[in-house]
């Protein structure tokens, strides 16, 4: 007796807490995850090492890392010589669009994922956007995701011809960071392999002070789960 092979799904995958949880959710949902990462000129390039570690630990058989020179465009603290904000409270984080916003990044990432999905014959794309903890980012909003999905179904040959419908999955969209940690923990995610810091030390240790580090620490604390992150010794 033979069984049908699981359907493929493209998972946008940075090696961070959110995208790793998203990868675990895609697998839980019965898909064969095809992980897609980008080397886009980010100052925290160490996240790609985390992505490789996680992919290996989770036995991901297809992991593509694409070069994408967004550093040539700049305009973000993650891709240009702009200071990463530190020691901000939640109110400050949510007050406006932060300088860590990378212009059109999720639009570009999702477009690349869409192209790869078309080649793979996949109709499902997972992205770990979160509208609660990153309310300042325009490309993490439900309206953006809905608009991109509508566009995708007008852009892909087989969707236009009626043979498939592109679905953008956002399982973390309305979860708090604590809720994400709880979900991933229930799915067996090893968060010690992941990386979230925007401004890591040369040896990869997290700064513990950027928005991403602070939200990550807050998530573990509120979830009552031990934080496995390795922070700089001064913290």
Swiss-Prot record:
Transmembrane stretches in the record are none
Positions with a binding annotation for Zn(2+):
197, 207, 210, 213
Cofactor annotation: Zn(2+)
Write out the GO biological process terms.
Answer: queuosine biosynthetic process
Q: How is the cofactor bound?
A: Binds 1 zinc ion per subunit.
Metabolic or biological pathway? Purine metabolism; 7-cyano-7-deazaguanine biosynthesis
Which reaction equation describes what this protein catalyses? 7-carboxy-7-deazaguanine + NH4(+) + ATP = 7-cyano-7-deazaguanine + ADP + phosphate + H2O + H(+)
**Residues that bind ATP:** 13-23
Q: Sorted alphabetically, which HAMAP family does this protein's record hold?
A: QueC
Family from the record: Belongs to the QueC family.
Identification of the protein by name: 7-cyano-7-deazaguanine synthase
């Amino acid at each position: 007796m033979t069984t049908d092979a699981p359907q493929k799904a493209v998972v946008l995958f940075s090696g961070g807490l959110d995208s790793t949880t998203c990868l675990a959710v895609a697998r839980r949902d019965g898909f064969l995850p095809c992980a897609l990462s980008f080397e886009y000129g980010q100052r925290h390039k160490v996240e790609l090492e985390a992505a490789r570690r996680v992919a290996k630990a989770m036995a991901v058989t297809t992991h593509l890392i694409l070069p994408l020179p967004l550093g040539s465009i700049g305009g973000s603290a993650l891709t240009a010589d702009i200071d990463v904000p530190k020691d901000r409270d939640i109110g400050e984080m949510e007050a406006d669009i932060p300088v860590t916003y990378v212009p059109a990044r999720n639009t570009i990432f999702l477009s690349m994922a869409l192209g790869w999905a078309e080649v793979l014959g996949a109709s499902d794309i997972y992205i770990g956007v979160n509208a609660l903890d990153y309310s300042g980012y325009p490309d993490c909003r439900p309206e953006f995701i809905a608009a991109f999905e509508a566009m995708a179904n007008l852009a892909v040959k087989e969707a236009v011809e009626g043979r498939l419908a592109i679905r953008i999955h956002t399982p973390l969209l309305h979860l708090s960071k604590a809720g994400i940690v709880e979900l991933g923990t229930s799915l067996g995610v090893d968060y010690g392999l992941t990386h979230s810091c925007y401004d890591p030390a040369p040896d990869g240790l997290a700064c513990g002070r950027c928005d991403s580090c602070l939200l990550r620490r807050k998530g573990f604390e509120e979830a009552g789960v031990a934080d496995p992150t390795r922070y700089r010794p001064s913290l």
